[in-house]
Amino acid sequence: MAKAAAIGIDLGTTYSCVGVFQHGKVEIIANDQGNRTTPSYVAFTDTERLIGDAAKNQVALNPQNTVFDAKRLIGRKFGDPVVQSDMKHWPFQVINDGDKPKVQVSYKGETKAFYPEEISSMVLTKMKEIAEAYLGYPVTNAVITVPAYFNDSQRQATKDAGVIAGLNVLRIINEPTAAAIAYGLDRTGKGERNVLIFDLGGGTFDVSILTIDDGIFEVKATAGDTHLGGEDFDNRLVNHFVEEFKRKHKKDISQNKRAVRRLRTACERAKRTLSSSTQASLEIDSLFEGIDFYTSITRARFEELCSDLFRSTLEPVEKALRDAKLDKAQIHDLVLVGGSTRIPKVQKLLQDFFNGRDLNKSINPDEAVAYGAAVQAAILMGDKSENVQDLLLLDVAPLSLGLETAGGVMTALIKRNSTIPTKQTQIFTTYSDNQPGVLIQVYEGERAMTKDNNLLGRFELSGIPPAPRGVPQIEVTFDIDANGILNVTATDKSTGKANKITITNDKGRLSKEEIERMVQEAEKYKAEDEVQRERVSAKNALESYAFNMKSAVEDEGLKGKISEADKKKVLDKCQEVISWLDANTLAEKDEFEHKRKELEQVCNPIISGLYQGAGGPGPGGFGAQGPKGGSGSGPTIEEVD
């Protein structure tokens, strides 16, 4: 057997996608619903946990306990303004636990709180299972993508989510870099090309400029808006229709979460329709206080509602060009990534900005990132096929990294857009006479003063021998590895004494113990989900057996072959079981199985007696189907009330 493949996962804000490189090409893997992208949603109910399509489909019924957008929380502090402003829009509750955000839900009748890493790990587990179902063997190795804009803490937290999901994360790579790989594979050997990647997804917007030369990718610049995407366009439509509902019906639905959620689902559908048609209609029965809401919207109106958002996508394009020191005429290829790039107006704005240049849409925009991640996974696993052999990947640091020097000045050691992995060393000294130690404070950001940048961590180097200011030599080294994880070391040259920090924990990262605990819990939840599945199938098996027996003895063809007493005996027992089922829908698996045995003891002798003479099926021939419930037997799906 060939060795197990590694997978590439695009962990998106709203949708995720998984791919695998095998037999010389990438397969994007469809989930059990046949969809090639899976909603990044996790829902908790009184009885079970749902992930993906199943979670998103029940969101209107259970908004408080359906979690999405975990990517907007991951690796951030609770007090982060982004978190604070996003919380206003979410129907689920975010609580503060030591300045770490946690999502609070009700699950199986208890209140539970989860870290964003745990929610993301559930989505990753789902993606892992989708791949395993397709490949037919367990998968552990994966490459996971993040926005180019993600800082160290967000990258670390994403990696932790992978670990909790039971994955060995080979590498975290930038989404645009992954898209470039998807694109570059087919494009090797054409001399140097400058490629601009325009990635407008469900929740984030990234513009990246890469140079591809003979299979070598180099990221020249990244820019973007961590908070622009398809959801924002949905919100504009939602607001538009809330106002329309007020005008038509003099009622404000905006405080009714379920109504807004149903409206949002319809808006998302309308938005997708408007990418291919010039008009879309919405029909929502009994949206609010029994009022049906039937309306429509034109593409022109939609473009007008979002015009400022659409136009704002060009600012990061200009910024990236400036950072890469390129003129727009020097860009060879424009690549569209992310579902929202299907919007005709967005395409037109970009095309006009580049004076009518053709856009590259040959890659399915929803799948390009997972495609590239799958290729990268194959490279890291040492895939020998010539398609991937010559590909080398150079990533960049998204923000400058440095330390605070006297007066709160930011002194950058690693400049933004430096190719990583990289290592930079600089000599610093003391600020006052006989200073016994120095405090090394590590920041990321582009501003001149550290107070405007983001503190990553700090540590002391003490025990410096007394000396006049400016004499001691302290060598500081910043070292970023291929995953974008930073090690900072300070060494006193006179004594050789050193101290270092790996930038992780001070960023509110989870500790080893917490990750370990979450891995255990993830296993536990998975086991519970399994028990739930078995319970439901035992219930369905019992239900279908009871209904089958009932219809068997009521069959007209059996008139005269079965005594009324026997018939009554079977019908009474079936009715008893059916009533018991209605009253005990939440019983355990063995209770259902026990009831079924009880029922079989009554029915089997009677039914098999019927067929002794007729040479029909032996005992239990009727409805003794396995847990799946036979053809047309009892409901195998339960309706949610």
Curated annotation (Swiss-Prot):
Q: Which domain of life is it from?
A: Eukaryota
Keywords tagged on the record: Acetylation, ATP-binding, Chaperone, Cytoplasm, Cytoskeleton, Host cell receptor for virus entry, Host-virus interaction, Methylation, Nucleotide-binding, Nucleus, Phosphoprotein, Receptor, Secreted, Stress response
Q: Where in the cell is it found?
A: Cytoplasm; Nucleus; Cytoplasm, Cytoskeleton, Microtubule organizing center, Centrosome; Secreted
Q: Sites of the modification Omega-N-methylarginine?
A: R469
Residues modified to N6-acetyllysine? K77, K108, K246, K348
Q: Where is this region: Nucleotide-binding domain (NBD)?
A: 2-386
Q: Name one GO biological process term.
A: positive regulation of NF-kappaB transcription factor activity
Region spans: Disordered: 614-641
Report residue spans for region: Substrate-binding domain (SBD).
394-509
Expression induction or repression = By heat shock.
| PTM characteristics | In response to cellular stress, acetylated at Lys-77 by NA110 and then gradually deacetylated by HDAC4 at later stages. Acetylation enhances its chaperone activity and also determines whether it will function as a chaperone for protein refolding or degradation by controlling its binding to co-chaperones HOPX and STUB1. The acetylated form and the non-acetylated form bind to HOPX and STUB1 respectively. Acetylation also protects cells against various types of cellular stress.
- CDD domains attached here? ASKHA_NBD_HSP70_HSPA1
What Gene Ontology terms describe where this protein resides (cellular component)?
A: aggresome; blood microparticle; centriole; centrosome; cytoplasm; cytosol; endoplasmic reticulum; extracellular exosome
* Phosphothreonine, modified sites: T636
Post-translational modification N6,N6-dimethyllysine, affected residues:
K561
Cite the binding residues for ATP.
Answer: 12-15, 71, 202-204, 268-275, 339-342
Q: What is known of its domains?
A: The N-terminal nucleotide binding domain (NBD) (also known as the ATPase domain) is responsible for binding and hydrolyzing ATP. The C-terminal substrate-binding domain (SBD) (also known as peptide-binding domain) binds to the client/substrate proteins. The two domains are allosterically coupled so that, when ATP is bound to the NBD, the SBD binds relatively weakly to clients. When ADP is bound in the NBD, a conformational change enhances the affinity of the SBD for client proteins.
Q: Which NCBIfam families match?
A: PRK00290.1 (NF001413)
Q: Which disease is it linked to?
A: In certain aggressive cases of activated B cell-like diffuse large B-cell lymphoma (ABC-DLBCL), plays a role in the cytoplasmic sequestration of misfolded N-terminal mutated PRDM1 proteins, promotes their association with SYNV1/HRD1 and degradation through the SYNV1-proteasome pathway. HSPA1A inhibition restores PRDM1 nuclear localization and transcriptional activity in lymphoma cell lines and suppresses growth in xenografts.
Quaternary structure, per UniProt, is: Component of the CatSper complex. Identified in a IGF2BP1-dependent mRNP granule complex containing untranslated mRNAs. Interacts with CHCHD3, DNAJC7, IRAK1BP1, PPP5C and TSC2. Interacts with TERT; the interaction occurs in the absence of the RNA component, TERC, and dissociates once the TERT complex has formed. Interacts with TRIM5 (via B30.2/SPRY domain). Interacts with METTL21A. Interacts with DNAAF2. Interacts with PRKN. Interacts with FOXP3. Interacts with NOD2; the interaction enhances NOD2 stability. Interacts with DNAJC9 (via J domain).
Q: Provide the family line.
A: Belongs to the heat shock protein 70 family.
| Name of the protein in question | Heat shock 70 kDa protein 1A
Recorded source organism is: Homo sapiens
- Encoding gene, per UniProt annotation: HSPA1A
